Amino acid sequence: MIHRVLITISLLVTGNLLASTTIIAIDEAFERGELTQDELILNKVYSFLQPELLDARFRGEQTELIKCGTPILIQYEAMQSDLAESTITIIEDLLSPRTDGLRETFFSPGGHFSFNYATTGTGAVPSADADGSGVPDYVEWAADYLDYTWAQEVDSAGFAGPNHVGGDGFYNVSFESMGAYGYCTTSAVDGSELTRLVLHNSYIGFGANQDPEGNVKGAMKVTCAHEFKHASQRSESNWSEGGWVELDATWAEEFVYDYVNDSMLNFMGSGDPYSHPHWGLDHDGSGSYEDYAWEDFMHQRFDGNSYVVAPILEYFWNWRQTHTNQNVMDSYAQALTQYGSSFPEAFGEYVVWNFFTGSRAVVTFGISQFGYDDAGVNGYPTATLATTHNSYPVSSSVTGIENLGCKMIRLNTSGQLGLEIDFDGQDGVQMSAMWAIRQDDNTVDWGSIDLDGSNNGSIVLDVRDATMAALIPVVTQLTGSTYGASYTIELNSLAECDPGDINDDNNLDVSDLVRLVAIILGNGAIPTDVEMCAADVNDDDQSNVQDVVTLVDLILQ
């Protein structure tokens, strides 16, 4: 039983580290029975805190950088009661605040944070002190960024602040040379604090971001927002959400420092809703960093894209305080219901937003006109298409859609009037068939095809003024395996008519009846679009003797 539980936790952490080859290799070795649980967690902790101690099997040519060490430490905490004392001692020693080098303490101007930093040794921060304050600029930056993060996440948005009662009365932060942006830990806390934060001591050599002040400041900013949100989560619900805490902390980067776009540039491209839209939001058992667009959608759609408040996500975390054992997706559904929507309805809109990003973003003068406010920002990913249709009629199908996943189908509309879609989704699954039309005036019309109990339905899209359209089958149920759908798309003339008025003279008489019979028998001139429309008198998508009977009844009325 322990082995099975550990595998589950390991899979969540693997997803959270965005396919770190080292972490994946460690997990796979454990699953093959080649590592004990103690060796598993030791190697994971070594991977970012002391890579030279890694088992030789997991060492690469260069040390891998991970986004966040917190999920590994959450896993360590969950396993702790089953670990050997020697293992705990090693890890606690690695997590203990550093004492080497000449060390100083600085208190943030906002009065919330205490920073312990070294000016000499391997963990020293950069020594530059441009303002001559006697405190390294690097430490002052961190203080400013965390003060601002507190103001945004706690004072403004209403998320819980970290518990830092007792001790020195400040929330403690330190700096380390390590293989992660940072981490939040429950080890070696001061007084009755729940957690403390550790930031990288230089952020030199980290991935590029879009902070106008440079990559170093940008990396520090998003780490402050991210790790501080972990501290808030711990106060809210004791990290009961598993890997979802990483999705939420990455969203916090967008909420606090939206212009930096570090995660967008460095942690997309593998398993996210753009590179793998057919993968479920909870692929491998949990959401993670790369899925932060889900909370970004919830916030922008239901909170008016405020960078001051975030009511729907505040509600979500308040709810989690008393529902720590509830499935996280059910908690999201509860929040959506509270804000006048439902999970299936919101998730259908979410995948439409995801279609119009990157090269398909709807942008005018650099401003997004639909969906995410940064959908057209340089570097924002473009969702992968299952296929593109350029000519019609066409019949096709899609498979391999996981629960909470979709397939995106582009419909080119050049020179077309209407497209008639007949959709046949797999039976026995909660599914939607979303459609969208990008008009040539840079507006987007979208909706869903009305499906019956067998997931069948049809719609005619007016694409006369469209630059493109989309069909997006999406599985909205919370659990399951993989599913599929088939569809047929035909041209539609969009002809307008009055049923039975074959001659289009606003009268129903014998001349209409004669022409109807000729059309059914294939006699006379080829019928026009209006005639074909009017010939379907009983609106069953075909013209036959039943239409003759119906027209006779109408004439005799």
Regions found by a protein language model. Name each.
Residues 14-15:
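N-terminal signal peptide c-region/cleavage motif recognized by signal peptidases
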Residues 494-557:
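Cellulosome-associated attachment modules in secreted, modular CAZymes
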Residues 198-269, 273, 285:
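Zinc-dependent metallopeptidase catalytic helix centered on the HExxH motif
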Residues 21-194, 200-228, 232-236, 432-438:
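Zn2+-dependent metallopeptidase catalytic core
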Residues 272-359:
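Active-site-proximal alpha-helical
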Residues 155-171, 234, 238-244, 263-267, ...:
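Surface-exposed patches in mature extracellular/periplasmic domains of secreted proteins
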Residues 2-8:
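Sec-dependent signal peptide recognition
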Residues 84, 322-496:
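Beta/coil-rich, acidic/histidine-enriched accessory regions frequently appended to metallopeptidases
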